[in-house]
UniProtKB/Swiss-Prot annotation:
Regions of compositional bias (Basic residues) in chain numbering: 31-97
InterPro entries attached to this UniProt entry: H1/H5 (IPR005819)
Chief localisation class: nucleus
Protein name: Histone H1.C2
Keywords: Chromosome, DNA-binding, Nucleus
Compartment(s) where it occurs, according to its Swiss-Prot or TrEMBL record: Nucleus; Chromosome
Length: 97
């Protein structure tokens, strides 16, 4: 334990010595004199435009109904197909007297 502490203290002191030497080698920098900067004229502020209200969202158009003529125009093949699919109605017999 003692060896570790001694080793650490030696390294720290060595680092400090090196740091001091390096600091002494580099002379401290002098602050550079500030150059006179030409002042900019402040830009004129333009008046803010009033906020434009967004137009209300348009309602979705209702689906257009097909004209009656289009509904009636059913092809013959479609009618036949529908007739095959439809359940056949039982023919009612007239009651016997």
């Amino acid at each position: 334990m003692f060896c570790v502490l001694k080793f650490l203290s030696c390294t720290l002191s060595r680092i400090n010595i090196v740091q001091k030497l390096s600091d002494a080698a580099v002379p401290p920098k002098k602050a550079a004199p500030k150059k006179a900067v030409a002042k900019k004229t402040p830009a004129k502020k333009t008046a803010k435009k009033p906020a434009v209200k967004k137009p209300a969202a348009k309602k979705r158009a209702a689906p257009k109904k097909k004209p009656a003529a289009a509904k009636k125009a059913v092809t013959k093949s479609a009618k036949k197909h529908a007739a095959k699919k439809a359940p056949k109605k039982a023919v009612k017999k007239a009651p016997k007297k």
